[in-house]
Amino acid sequence: MQIVNISAYKFVSLDDIETLRPAMRERCEAAGLKGTILLAPEGINLFLAGPREAIDGFMAWLHADARFADIAPKESLSENQPFKRMLVRAKKEIITMKMPLIRPEAGRAPSVRPADLKRWLDQGHDDEGRPVVMLDTRNDFEVAVGTFENAVEYDIAKFSEFPDAVAAHKAELDGKTVVSFCTGGIRCEKAAIHMQEVGIERVYQLEGGILKYFEEVGGSHYRGDCFVFDYRTALNPSLEPAGPKQCFACRAVVTPEQQQSPHYVVGKSCPHCIGGKDRAAA
């Protein structure tokens, strides 16, 4: 049976989490869905997988709530269920930055559609002639799997390090059009709002993140694959599972070449473990 995988998020003020949480868990469990839903005062972030009918039924139920009516999930297909259980969690933030909470009612940062971004990158500047800086907001191990050509990345181990990294390099972004990007949009949206708040004038978020860019325009101006947080580890620009795998022991990304090492034992170890590099994803 083919499994539909969806991911979606929205920054929206929620003050009824204690009611939403059991209702969502009951709905998902009744439909046989598995995955994780995060609820916080600043919004919702979800990753679900299951049969098409069950996914469509849940989304119809979710859309009946006016706060979530415009959520458009990103989809992919798999032969296997990537999640082991169904979790609905209440959190302080739907993506951890450890900064003052996003205020959804204040609005989101401007976004740039994948097709428009491709045009900017093709021509070497935005529509007003300013240079474009592609700013990768992801963790270092994700960037190592693939990123945009000439992208700026701050070698951060977790997203909560992003504000300090931006503060240290803020002057380098002056006078340029900054496009923040991430896997599916949630981190680059929060990052873009933060950059606006600290005085960076021309900031955009890549609408839908790297995966939406792959879906709409392919891999133009992108090098490598895109790390994803499930059993597939990485997707290529055709949104197909790629070669890199994640080590279950240390969570490092293992390239196809590294998988040939005698130190790579599925589920047990990899060259990173043996070499002492044990950085957990956060």
From Swiss-Prot:
Residues the record marks as active site: C182
Any one of the GO BP annotations: tRNA modification
Which keywords, in A-to-Z order, does the entry hold?
Answer: Oxidoreductase, tRNA processing
Rhodanese domain boundaries = 128-222
Catalytic reaction equation(s): uridine(34) in tRNA + AH2 + O2 = 5-hydroxyuridine(34) in tRNA + A + H2O
SUPFAM superfamilies found in the cross-reference section: Rhodanese/Cell cycle control phosphatase (SSF52821)
- Sequence intervals crossing the membrane: none
- What GO molecular function annotations does the UniProt record carry, in alphabetical order? oxidoreductase activity, acting on paired donors, with incorporation or reduction of molecular oxygen
Q: Per its UniProt record, what InterPro entries does this chain match? A: Rhodanese-like_dom (IPR001763), Rhodanese-like_dom_sf (IPR036873), TrhO (IPR020936), TRHO_N (IPR040503)
Question: Which Enzyme Commission number(s) are listed?
Answer: 1.14.-.-
Pfam families documented for this protein: Rhodanese (PF00581), UPF0176_N (PF17773)
Entry superkingdom? Bacteria
| Top enzyme category | oxidoreductase
* PANTHER family to which the protein is assigned, alphabetical: RHODANESE-LIKE DOMAIN-CONTAINING PROTEIN 7-RELATED (PTHR43268:SF3), THIOSULFATE SULFURTRANSFERASE/RHODANESE-LIKE DOMAIN-CONTAINING PROTEIN 2 (PTHR43268)
The record's family statement is: Belongs to the TrhO family.
Summarize the protein's role. Catalyzes oxygen-dependent 5-hydroxyuridine (ho5U) modification at position 34 in tRNAs.
* Protein name stated in the entry: tRNA uridine(34) hydroxylase
| Organism of this sequence | Cupriavidus taiwanensis (strain DSM 17343 / BCRC 17206 / CCUG 44338 / CIP 107171 / LMG 19424 / R1) (Ralstonia taiwanensis (strain LMG 19424))
> By which gene is this protein encoded?
trhO
